[in-house]
Curated annotation (Swiss-Prot):
It holds the Pfam family IGPS. Belongs to the TrpC family. Its EC number is 4.1.1.48. The gene is trpC. The lineage of its organism: Bacteria, Bacillati, Actinomycetota, Actinomycetes, Micrococcales. This is Indole-3-glycerol phosphate synthase. SUPFAM superfamilies: Ribulose-phoshate binding barrel (SSF51366). Keywords: Amino-acid biosynthesis, Aromatic amino acid biosynthesis, Decarboxylase, Lyase, Tryptophan biosynthesis. Gene3D superfamilies: Aldolase class I. It is an enzyme of class 4 (lyase). NCBIfam families: PRK00278.1-1, PRK00278.2-4. GO terms for molecular function: indole-3-glycerol-phosphate synthase activity; phosphoribosylanthranilate isomerase activity. It comes from the Bacteria. Pathway: Amino-acid biosynthesis; L-tryptophan biosynthesis; L-tryptophan from chorismate: step 4/5. It comes from Paenarthrobacter aurescens (strain TC1). One of its GO terms (biological process) is L-tryptophan biosynthetic process.
Amino acid sequence: MTVLDDIIVGVKEDMEVRRGLVSLAELKERAANAAPARDAWAALGGPSSIRNDLKVIAEIKRRSPSKGDLASIADPASLAVQYADGGASVISVLTEQRRFGGSLADFDAVRAAVETPLLRKDFTVDEYQIWEARAHGADLILLIVAALSDAELADFSALSHELGMNVLVETHTEEEIERAVAAQAKIIGINVRNLKTLDVDRSVFGSLAGLIPAESVIVAESGVRGPEDVSHYAAGGANAILVGEALVSDSTPRERITEFKAAGAAAIAVRN
């Protein structure tokens, strides 16, 4: 069993516990009464003609399968405010509990604190989670190609869009990018971390980014340690980066985001 397979087993078990407490019908009612979703695609650059800087998806993450504990984050709302003040275009909130230490309570706290579009970061394997995300005020959800069939990818994308949310479709290989493009994904992430082994290879981004259509927003995921990595991704075609560890482990995340945005903008200016 791969690391991804093991995570999904736990995700399904935890989801069934929540389903026993809150029915799908109740989630649908809550989703109907939720404030309209914010346009995360526009926040990440939208049409290719207006993408002239690097966007940052700043992540709230207590731990990870590869590194273990990263930060205690007693007040995720306060951290989210710092992210927003630093210029994050989207804030990602982990809600997977077993491996990442996240929760929907974290998400709710962040949602109440900022107007920035929010990514509900979890391993989506059931429509229940999509309704759940919208009911809690999510604007963007994650769909990992490696974890889904083509039918699931299409159906989950369609439901998300029907509910007004955008979708970040995560890939790691050429075949997965082909599947994401076939699903008409508008926001495509390239995760340089292999979720089956947890190995990181930053060169993966450069070898795959050119396969993504220009109209899609390209997000570089994982492997950001500092401005040099940001410049590398931006020079290679990234429109946005998703970064968590480098922010939650830093005492000045607001300034760190500003630094990353400056490095990205400089690289994009050269690229263009």
